[in-house]
Regions:
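Structural motif
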Residues: 22, 74-76
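Aromatic- and Lys/Arg-enriched surface recognition patch
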Residues: 78-102
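Short, conserved catalytic or interaction motifs in soluble domains
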Residues: 62-65, 82
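Acidic, low-complexity mobile loops and tails
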Residues: 1-55, 93-129
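Short connector loops at helix/strand junctions that flank enzyme active sites
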Residues: 64, 70-72, 96-99
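Short coil-to-beta-strand transition motifs
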Residues: 7-10, 68-74
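Generic structural signal for buried aliphatic residues
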Residues: 51, 57-58, 77-78
Length: 129
């Protein structure tokens, strides 16, 4: 299981990569392992939509369970990974790369301070085992 040091994480297993004012969001390697084989991805927000931290941005279904993906920081949706619903298996094979879900222009960068760094996220995972 990988936890990239350059990302921030939520306690609910989402990640965000910040580049300037743009945040790219997806789910963690740990989350995809827990869900098992992802068979369905539905991104439930639209480009141009303003979404608040904690709102659902996607629904995932696996052979074991269904899960919602929540936005780690508020922003305006500037890009959606349109390929993901056609290739949901990428969530398992490349959760930090090709399986990004949306990109947002961050509207409240202070919310990032509430997220976990890689070490804190790894500690949270260890507590769950």
């Amino acid at each position: 299981m990988t936890v990239p040091a350059n990302l921030k994480f939520t306690a609910n297993d989402e990640w965000i990569k910040v580049d300037g004012k743009i945040g790219t969001i997806g789910i963690t390697d740990y989350a995809q392992e827990q869900l098992s084989d992802i068979v369905f991805v539905e991104i439930v927000v639209a480009e141009g939509e303003v979404v608040n931290k904690g709102e659902s941005i996607a629904t995932l279904e696996s052979v074991k369970a269904a899960a919602d993906v929540y936005l780690p920081a508020s922003g305006k949706v500037v890009a959606i990974n349109d390929a993901l619903p056609e290739t949901p298996e990428k969530v398992n094979s490349d959760p930090y790369g090709e399986a990004w879900m949306i990109k947002v222009e961050l509207t409240n960068v202070a919310e990032l301070d509430e997220l976990l760094d890689a070490a804190a996220y790894e500690a949270k995972i260890a507590e769950n085992h």
